[in-house]
């Protein structure tokens, strides 16, 4: 699923969601394991429009969408160096569940029960 956040017909944010589980997350012990997760793969906000709450609104949309579609949790990851995203996820009630390493670096995994 790919959803756009628009302002006056201009895209200023996107969110990409896919049904889980994600194969990259096999090493993670999820708190809601054995359930049906929705996985966030991308959250992007126009740099000129950051700090306006758009990321939070997109995340709230993802949580509502996931719950309405019958998913039991939302799982995601972010680069260890991406403190802005990590702070957002933690402020929204996401729990750190572990780390993974991919060819692009190290990532922190987060989860929230829906």
Annotate each predicted stretch with a short phrase.
Residues 34-37, 72-86, 90-92, 99-114:
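C-terminal "cap" of GNAT-fold acetyltransferases
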Residues 1-3, 66, 85, 92, ...:
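Alpha-helix boundary/capping detector
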Residues 13-18, 86-89, 94:
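A broad helix-preferring feature
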Residues 42-45, 51-64, 87-91:
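Conserved acetyl-CoA-binding loop-helix of GNAT-fold acetyltransferases
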Residues 9, 13, 53-55, 93:
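Conserved phosphate-binding and hydrolysis motifs of nucleotide-dependent enzymes
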